[in-house]
Each structure stands twice: as C-alpha cells, then as structure tokens.
Amino acid sequence: MPPKTPRKTAATAAAAAAEPPAPPPPPPPEEDPEQDSGPEDLPLVRLEFEETEEPDFTALCQKLKIPDHVRERAWLTWEKVSSVDGVLGGYIQKKKELWGICIFIAAVDLDEMSFTFTELQKNIEISVHKFFNLLKEIDTSTKVDNAMSRLLKKYDVLFALFSKLERTCELIYLTQPSSSISTEINSALVLKVSWITFLLAKGEVLQMEDDLVISFQLMLCVLDYFIKLSPPMLLKEPYKTAVIPINGSPRTPRRGQNRSARIAKQLENDTRIIEVLCKEHECNIDEVKNVYFKNFIPFMNSLGLVTSNGLPEVENLSKRYEEIYLKNKDLDARLFLDHDKTLQTDSIDSFETQRTPRKSNLDEEVNVIPPHTPVRTVMNTIQQLMMILNSASDQPSENLISYFNNCTVNPKESILKRVKDIGYIFKEKFAKAVGQGCVEIGSQRYKLGVRLYYRVMESMLKSEEERLSIQNFSKLLNDNIFHMSLLACALEVVMATYSRSTSQNLDSGTDLSFPWILNVLNLKAFDFYKVIESFIKAEGNLTREMIKHLERCEHRIMESLAWLSDSPLFDLIKQSKDREGPTDHLESACPLNLPLQNNHTAADMYLSPVRSPKKKGSTTRVNSTANAETQATSAFQTQKPLKSTSLSLFYKKVYRLAYLRLNTLCERLLSEHPELEHIIWTLFQHTLQNEYELMRDRHLDQIMMCSMYGICKVKNIDLKFKIIVTAYKDLPHAVQETFKRVLIKEEEYDSIIVFYNSVFMQRLKTNILQYASTRPPTLSPIPHIPRSPYKFPSSPLRIPGGNIYISPLKSPYKISEGLPTPTKMTPRSRILVSIGESFGTSEKFQKINQMVCNSDRVLKRSAEGSNPPKPLKKLRFDIEGSDEADGSKHLPGESKFQQKLAEMTSTRTRMQKQKMNDSMDTSNKEEK
C-alpha cells in the first residue's frame, strides 16, 4: 500500500482550505487532497534535523559517505515510511534494513550515489531479493523503480550464469587430481579465473547488462580458452581427449608454464573444444563461433595478461574488474565465488531452478531430467525455433515466386529491396543497443527473422488460395504496411526467443523487448496489431510461450501503444464516426456477449474497409481478396462507405480486455457490491466509445480506475483511490507508472488522482451523475470472455458444453536424445488419454462432443419455441450405416439423435461386458 502522510504541512492545509466549493448540482465527491506524495515532494531542509536523527542512522550514513542533503532526504523518507501502519508489518522493527532502503531511494532520486549497491548491502546485511521485496512495498518514484528493475535484472542474469558456470566446471575439471597438479592449479582456481575473466569480457563486449544468450555464448568462449590452458590431467572426458592434440601429452604444470605463447595461434584457430562445449550445451555452433572470433579473441588480445602456472593472475584480473565495479556502483559479482549471503536467494523462490516432478512409478524407465534453469529454458526455446527454420530459406521459395508472378503488379523486386534495406537498419540499431562488436550477431538474428517472414507469408497465401480458389494477391502483396508488419512480427518472435522477455510483464524484459522492433522499423503499433492473429494462425509450430508472448504484445498495443497521438487509430475512428454517425459508431450495435470469431485474414485487416454495413435480411459475406479489392475500389462510388474490419475487431478485443481487468479488480474490491460491476463497465465502455479522446497518450487502466472511483462515489461506496491503486498494483501486468504518471495536458503529467479531478470528472461529470438518478442509463452488454483467442498447440482442448478433454500428444519439437520431449508419455499422461483403448482415437471424442453440443443446442431452442437459424454445418447421421450387430433396433418415431445416443449406449455396454469377461478370465487363470 502506498504510504500515507498523516500530518499535513501548512502549505497543504492552506491549499485545501483555498479550494472553491463545487457549484450545484454537486459533482462526484473528489478524493481527499492528501495524495501519494513521492520522495520528490519532500522538502530538502528541515529545522533541527540533527536533533531528530537517530545516532545509528547517522553512523550508517557516515560509513557510506552520504552527503548531508541526501541524508536529510533519506531521514524524511524513513519518517514517512515508519508512520504508515501495517504497510511493512514486522519489518519496522528492523530499522537498519529500512534505513538502507531509504538511503538508496534518496540517493537515486537526487543522483548522488556515493556508494556501491554491494557496500550498502554489506552495511545493512540484506540480500538482493529481500532488499527489493521491501522496496516494492514503499511508494517510490519512477526513477527509483527503473533503477531497481535494472539492478534486479542484472542480478538475475549473473546469478543464472554463475550457477551454470559452477555446474559446468564440475563436469569439466577433476576435483581431486594428482598431487603434483593440485598444489599449483586446481578446479577452484580455474573457476575463479574463468568467472572474473568472463565478467571483464561481458563488461567490454556487451552494453546490455541483462542479455542472457550472448552472455552465455561468451561464457562458453571463456571456458574454451581456459580448457586449452589447463593440463589434460586436470580434465574429465570428453575434454581431456579434445585438448591433448593442442597441449600434447599430459605434463606437469611447471613444464607447461611458458606454453601460452606457443599455443597462442592455436587458441585462436582451433575450435574442437568449442564444438564439444556447444554439443554438450546444445548451442548453435555458428553463433558461438561468431562471438568467439569477432568478440572474445580481440578482447583477450587487448588484455595483455600476465600468466602464472599457465593461467592469468587472479590479482591482476580482480584489479581490472574493481575499476568497472566502482564505476557502475552496483553489484560486486566476484562475491558469487564466495557464495556471499548478500547474493543468495531463497531456495523456495529461486530464480535459478524449477525442477520437474519425479516419476511415481518405480517400474517405469527413469529418464534423467535436467533442471529447468534460465539458461536451459532459453536454449531449448532457441532450438525449437531452429527446428522450425531449418528447412526455411532467407530467399523467397519457388512457391512464393509463383504467387508473385501471378500478381497483376509483381511485388518481388520491392519485397527483396525492402528486406535488404531493413536489414541495414536492423543491424545498426541492434549493435547500438547491444554493443558495437555485435553487428554480426544482429545479422544472424535478422536472417532468422527473414526466414520466418517468408515462411509465414507463404503459409498465409496457401491458406487464402485454398479458401478462395484464387492466386492473384496483388493488392495485399504490394501493400508496404502489410510487409513491414509481417517482417516486424517475425523479428519480434526471434528477438523474444533469444531473450527472457517472454515473462508475464513486457516491461521486465531486456532493452530489445517489445516495442523495440516497432521503433527500429518506424512502424505504428496499430498496424503491427493487425498481423498478430493471422501470423499465429499461419505458423502452426509456434510454441505456447511464444503465442502467449505475442498475445501480451497485442494487449500492450490495445492498452496504450495504439492510443499514442501519432497512431492511425484516431483517424480511423474519426472516419468511422463521420460515415456512420454516433448511433452506429464502432461496436454499439454489435452484441458483445457473443464469442469473438477468429476468422479474420491479413487481407481483411490490411485492405480494410472490406465490408458494407449489413442490411436486414442480408447474408452476403465478402471473403475473397479479389472481392475485397473490388469492394475497396468501389467504396468511393457508394452512398454509404464501408465499415472498417480492423477497427471493428480492434474495439471488440479492447472491450474484452478492458472488462476482464475490470472484473478482476471488482472481485478484489467490490465483492460485497456485485451490482456495481455492470454499472462501472457501462461508464467504462461509454468512455472508450464516445470519449475516446481521453485515451490519447494515456492507458486503458487509467480510465478503468477512474470509472470505478467515479461510480463508487455517486453510489456512496467508500472506496478511496489509494485502495484502488493498491489492488491494481497486484495485477500481473501492472506497473507503477500507470497511476503515478498520467497525462494532464500537453507535456504535463501528474498522479491519477489529479487526472480524475481535473480531466476525467470534468469531461464525464454529467454522465456520471446520471447513475445517481432514479432513471439511470441503459447498461452496456457484458462482453463474452474467452480463455484466450488463440489455441495453444500443447494445451488440453475443452469443448464447451461437454465433459471430454482432448490433449494432443504430439509436438513438432524433439530436442535431442536423453532430454524430455512432449512426445514422451509419462504414466500420468497415459492415464489422461487412454479412456477405453478399444473405443478409438481423439477424433472420435471430438465427434461425440460436436454431436452432444449441437443436439443440446437444438433441443434447447425447440423447447423455447423459437425457430433457430440453420447451422453452418449439419450433423448427418447415416442410418443405413449404423451398426446393428448388437441387435439394437430403432423405433420409427425416434429422432436421429435418439438413435445415435442408443447406439453409443449400446457400444459402451458391450465394452463394459468385454472388460468384465476379461477380468473373469484373468481371475480364473490365477486360480488355476
């Protein structure tokens, strides 16, 4: 909960007293002027400051060499935090820890960091995760939030990498080699030298502190370097065999002390060790070799290291790292070597390991399943992408060229030129973000994106050809925005695969996380949104995690990015209003309680508008791209222009996302007043539809919280904005900036309370007051909320209205022998899918579900006495083909459904009898 300030200052009291009374009729009561004041609101000077300060706090500041003005700000922050009841629970007693956190907040806000983060940790004896868990409970500025996020991401990556290095060294080096070696060189020394060398290389090569993949590839290069320097007697297989051709026969370290110069060229050119490492860790050998030759070797040559026992001197390496550490003023990663408690994490909440369940059946074959570490997870994800793209090309296939040739205007040359031009821009931007030495890495990523781009484009065109029986897609394939969006989506899949940005919150990703790709391609978020659904449907091999990632990108666009001032969305809305008028605007006439039909194609979205406003009795549907082009061309000749498919679908999805979030918040805050949810939703939906300018450069959740607060006020429900904000912070996608920094007017930002009072309530005052009258407005329909508009390939499929679940057992991904794959069944999975082996396959279960659901729907409609519309597809039961071997007969008056149901019942009876007979036979044999 954000901290409160119980004692108002004189200035605040005067401001409150000076507020003019609201004219009648009274507007919704506004929030108390006492707000969540951040650290920037605290005064820098205070009378008799030293007298109020505790001696231990002063001593802590002296140890950290804190300037006076930072110390004063930190103490005032402490007073503010400690005055709030229940916010930090029992932690208030641990003053030293909270003092340190307050010092950190003040130092970041004032840009006066006179200490390193590790120094602060050591002085208050606190771990990284505990520090940040406490900090999250305190209301801090965006500046502090960003600093905290950067440090935590860096820590998470370093923790994962050190854990990986430690385990890998155990697999490479002998812990107890012969006595002649152990006195001068051992595995502990190699680990220490390798880790510090890696830290130096990472700091030099990478500008991004939280890139996990390139960092791990760099770590493999470090391992390769020191394996080659190590005596073979110190190594385990297969490294011992691989290193002998380089180092010669096993020798004592004293005889090999001066061999570094002799094998310098071999270190640069021999790749046998790096190939073994890549095979063991299932890394792409070409990518690692690129990092090795382009980045690592030049870095090592620039160090000019002095060696001892064939290894660089630890003191020399440590001194070089000390300079980087003091400059960055953050974590001293050398402490990982000592397993320092400030860098350890709780074993239960460990970021580093999430182990898979053990097999319960001891008779089953035991597969050794490695722990799912961050490195292993991202490597598996990359390998899955490679499996998809192995057969793909970074040039258009023959099928694609055939489609190009069938176009009225051949798009081939423009497509190739666009791909080439964007490639230069992408590599430049990638190197700027990651490091200037990483241009070639950017080129490799771009080539993967281009492969996926051509692959998905071909899949889209094939699907359209099968659906429409046409091959001329000239208008779509000559649309620049379509190609830019499709290429951007392919590149986003690649970038997300190589990063950890597939987390729940996109803001917690790396510098290359979405919407980075939009900035690189200078693409509007609303245009990018149009391709997401078609992309997912066209590429059936996307992993569940990647589909979820693209869905989160879609949510990010719908909640804020599509509402930026320069977005084409506002022009589209204005055109829609001008054409159709306020009564037929957007989705006002569309039933929101119906499921969202995902049958929109790229042509629908990018050649929109593609359909005329429907007239009564009209059943015409524009499906073909050719028709779409004709419709778009003739739009200017009709009296009433065409509707926009892309805008219509966008608003449907926005409404569903908005209601889902509102529903979650209402369940947490208004469980005792469930009737208010529908009213709040009506105001919320009205604002999005009719006052959409309030969304310009703002966030969907800001309108949601204001709608909730306004309705609660007119309904006399005591719900403070602070309570709403506190509950909102617990939502998985929430970031504090959403309620701390809201646009008030051009280039002026303030808290959400100020936005409500000065903007939202002023615009919607009349509408809000209607809900307090005896004749409130008609309530808006509640949107139908599906679990997800996209089907995940590995998810159990639940058919609405039925009780049978079908779980696909096959996956296109097979990692490698010895590793778990989705195709390997466990005893648990066998039980889930084997429901009567003689009955049939999952397709039969699907048919049963279809039959039951359709028949239930028909019976229900018949009972209501209505004439239901004809279904798109009829269930046809072939009576002549029925199985009467069991002697079942059908009465003349029976419906087809009743006949089929009787057959199913009979079949099940036969199965049960067969099982009973089998059981009796088995028991008889045992008795004999």
From Swiss-Prot:
Expressed in the retina. Expressed in foreskin keratinocytes (at protein level). Residues 640-771 are annotated as: Domain B. Residues 373-579 are annotated as: Domain A. InterPro entries: Cyclin-like_dom, Cyclin-like_sf, RB_A, RB_B, RB_C, RB_fam, RB_N. Residues 8-19 have a biased composition (Low complexity). GO terms for biological process: aortic valve morphogenesis; cell differentiation; cell division; cell morphogenesis involved in neuron differentiation; cellular response to insulin stimulus; cellular response to xenobiotic stimulus; chondrocyte differentiation; chromatin remodeling. Changing residue 137 to D: In RB; unilateral form. Residues 619-632 have a biased composition (Polar residues). Residues 771-928 are annotated as: Domain C. The modification N6-acetyllysine is found at residues 873-874. Its main location: nucleus. The keyword DNA-binding applies. Residues 29-39 have a biased composition (Acidic residues). The modification Phosphothreonine is found at residues 252, 356, 373, 821, 823, 826, 841. Residues 580-639 are annotated as: Spacer. The modification Phosphoserine is found at residues 37, 249, 567, 608, 612, 624, 780, 788, 795, 807, 811, 855. Residues 1-42, 610-632, 860-928 are annotated as: Disordered. A motif (Bipartite nuclear localization signal) lies at residues 860-876. Tumor suppressor that is a key regulator of the G1/S transition of the cell cycle. The hypophosphorylated form binds transcription regulators of the E2F family, preventing transcription of E2F-responsive genes. Both physically blocks E2Fs transactivating domain and recruits chromatin-modifying enzymes that actively repress transcription. Cyclin and CDK-dependent phosphorylation of RB1 induces its dissociation from E2Fs, thereby activating transcription of E2F responsive genes and triggering entry into S phase. This is Retinoblastoma-associated protein. It comes from Homo sapiens.
